Amino acid sequence: MKIHTVALVAALCFSSQAFAEVSLTTGAGYANMAKELAKAFSATSGNKVTENFGGNIGQMMAQIANGNGANVVISDEGTLKSLKTPVQLTDIHSLGNTPLVFIWKKGLNLKGVSDLGTDKVKQFAYPDPKAAIYGRAAQQYLDNLGPNTVTKDKVMKIASVPQVTAYVVKGEVDAGFVNRTATRANKEKIGGSEELTKGYAPIHMIAAVVGHLFGVVAGEG
């Protein structure tokens, strides 16, 4: 399912009514996607969106709790539910599911993820499962392949989606698991890709407005 721009526009419109300025945050792995959606909102509404990106979503939510001003959050629903934070989110809009994507470096002739267990792939990477939803999805996918499909010496865990993508683009690893946005942004720099829709828990994206923080309700002075 494609990410629903209309749903994000609705969330940003609500935020623009509740706050003086729309300020958007997300984790590093979703930054490019969030930028695309914010651009669509600005084109539709004429309102500017301030972008607050940098760390993983846990770090960004901690910044909101400390008063950095972000009032709209984009992330996957599972990660947001797992975070321990005083930030309460309201006006939640579904953006749809987004897939795990297997990519490989230029010059490597692969059919797709089915070649992962062959000698064609000497080493591959995926994001740290403790820090990134795509890392957890990749781990689930690999676990479902069976214990003997991929040897441990092939696997490299890297902090985030952008870093995994960079390793593949530079040829430091043969392949990696990332997201659709990273794949599209680097389509001219990689050898190929395959979207995976099974073998892991669905990654459901949402946009939500910061509704309650330290006793202050959105829209109330």
Can you annotate each of these PLM segments?
Residues 14-20:
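Sec/Tat signal peptide C-region and signal peptidase I cleavage site
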Residues 21-46, 50-221:
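Exported/periplasmic ABC-transporter solute-binding proteins
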Residues 13-14, 43:
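Intrinsically disordered, low-complexity segments
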Residues 11-13, 220:
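Repetitive helical segments and hydrophobic/amphipathic motifs
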Residues 2-9, 17:
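Sec-dependent signal peptide recognition
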